[in-house]
């Protein structure tokens, strides 16, 4: 795990590396929620199927030297753009079986509207900007997917 001690405009950021077993509750507990009236969370899970094809697992490869920095910059931008107080994020790397957690994002804020907006923006931008690649292993074999979406 790595915690970036950076505080932005009163905001706290926590980024966790998650090569195995992403525990979203543990990630949420890293945030000090004093002064927050809302927490909005997103938990991405491997579906196990895609257009009728059984998916056994997804395999995520990441540019580890850059991943933490990209997630931190996304969190900083969310704090500054939406006025939220705290952000915690983690994304799995390696194999992730059907039904297992892939990504967890928690956004804490004095008010819910900003937390919802920031959380949605964070997952959308993570899928675009994070240096992570996804391989799908299914009943039809293996294939690299374009983007994380």
PLM region spans:
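N-terminal, polar/charged subdomain of small-to-medium soluble alpha/beta proteins
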Residues: 2-101, 108-149
């Amino acid at each position: 795990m790595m915690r970036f001690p950076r505080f932005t405009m009163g905001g706290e950021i926590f980024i966790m590396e998650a090569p195995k077993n992403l525990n979203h509750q543990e990630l949420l507990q890293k945030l000090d929620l004093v002064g927050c009236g809302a927490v909005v969370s997103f938990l991405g899970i491997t579906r196990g199927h895609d257009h009728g094809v059984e998916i056994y697992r997804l395999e995520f490869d990441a540019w580890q030297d850059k991943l933490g920095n990209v997630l931190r910059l996304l969190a900083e931008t969310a704090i500054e753009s939406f006025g939220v107080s705290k952000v915690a994020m983690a994304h799995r790397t390696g194999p992730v079986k059907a039904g297992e957690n892939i990504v967890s994002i928690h956004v804490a804020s004095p008010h819910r509207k900003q937390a919802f907006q920031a959380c949605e923006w964070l997952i959308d931008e993570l899928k675009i900007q994070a240096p992570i690649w996804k391989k799908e292993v299914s009943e039809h074999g293996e294939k690299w997917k374009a983007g994380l979406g």
